[in-house]
Design a protein with these regions (language model features):
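Polar/charged, compositionally biased leader and regulatory segments
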Residues: 1-139, 250-276
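Short loop/turn microsegments at loop-to-beta-strand junctions
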Residues: 145-146, 300, 306-310, 316
Length: 344
């Protein structure tokens, strides 16, 4: 009758909408709403990664390379969008003038950042009325052709070319396991055409193996050359591709599915934020209040913000080996020394 048809219509509409959503993602949502981890064992995976010995992703360890943080929140108003070909020239203009050409200059895009660039159809779905805009990986901007190495042992899960505009282009997913045998995955997006010749599904990979090269605009989905690096605790029901951005309102669920990829890079937090007082500003102040008899070293002035172990860390998160200060005999910020100072 008419009454039943009217009351059933919303139910059928809901069923049609649910049918468009990854069923494993629906389970993850329900688990999180019930107070559990969205993915069983997600915290075990992050704990395991935090203690692993890892091989650098690039030939030069990103922790020691010159770099720049690339937030898209408007704090760099002159920066073109990552999908704008003008970005390449802008990035080159940021390179320090005295940096030797054989040394890398990297840009880092932020995990968990809300971005407005994701306008293509694949970033909208039935799980929410909002678009998926919150970044689930870390971006490493470097020249096309830059070699990518496996950070840890694994097996090739998939090698795919995702051809949609603003998708990943050539995409690699590796399967790994924790010390307790729990599986997890790492995803490498925006790769070059050399990928199929380097990796095949089922192939065993050792930490440090060459697995890919960065792709150029025509093969990486239409982006400035960069690596999208992502940790995935469960592929849900996806194959060959995976969500690179999540819904802001469902972030607590997405963060269990794809925790911070800095677990693989171990970059200092300064690598992902802008310093409100760059070295140039401090140098100008210094010239006003300190006499010239106290000189400053290096042509490109360093702003050291803290130390850790044998390393000094500048305002961009770059590490410098400290071969000057005696404190490196025990290490900067040694917990026993810090505790003794606090007691005294």
């Amino acid at each position: 009758n008419d009454y039943l048809l009217i009351s059933q219509a919303p139910a059928f509409a809901l069923l049609e909408r649910l049918d468009q959503i990854d069923p494993a993602f629906l389970i993850a949502l329900c688990r999180k709403a019930a107070g559990y981890e969205a993915i069983p064992g997600a915290s075990d995976i992050t704990a395991d990664l935090a203690t692993r010995d890892l091989h650098p992703i690039l030939s030069t360890d990103p922790r020691r390379a010159a770099r720049i943080a690339l937030p898209t929140d408007g704090s760099r108003p002159d920066m073109p969008a990552f999908s704008d070909r003008a970005f390449d020239g802008w990035m080159q203009a940021q390179r320090p003038a005295n940096l030797p050409q054989d040394l890398p200059f990297l840009g880092f895009g932020l995990y968990g950042e809300k971005r407005s660039v994701y306008t293509a159809a694949q970033f909208a779905d039935a799980a929410s009325e909002e678009r998926r805009t919150r970044h689930l990986g870390i971006d490493i901007f470097a020249p096309a052709g830059t070699a990518i190495h496996a950070p840890l042992d694994g097996v090739v899960e998939s090698v795919t070319y995702n051809a949609d505009p603003l998708d990943y282009g050539h995409t690699l997913i590796l399967r790994h396991a924790t010390a307790q045998g729990r599986p997890f995955f790492t995803l490498y997006g925006h790769l070059g055409g050399s990928l199929p010749g380097l990796c095949t599904p089922g192939q065993a990979i050792k930490a440090g193996d060459l697995i890919a090269h960065l792709g150029d605009w025509h093969e990486n989905g239409g982006w400035a050359p960069h690596l999208h690096l992502q940790v995935v605790t469960s592929l849900l029901t996806q194959a060959g591709n995976f969500f690179g951005v999540g819904h802001d309102s469902l972030w607590d669920t997405w963060a269990d599915i794809s925790p911070d990829a800095n677990l693989l890079l171990r970059l200092e937090p300064e690598s992902f934020r802008l310093d409100p007082e760059p070295p140039e500003a401090l140098l100008a102040l210094r010239q006003k209040v300190i006499g010239p008899s106290l000189s400053v070293s290096y042509r490109e002035k360093l702003k050291i913000v803290r130390g850790r172990g044998a390393w000094l860390i500048d305002h961009t998160g770059r590490r410098y080996l400290d071969t000057v200060n005696n404190i490196t005999h025990v290490g900067h910020c040694h917990p026993h020394v810090v505790a003794a100072i606090a007691r005294q």
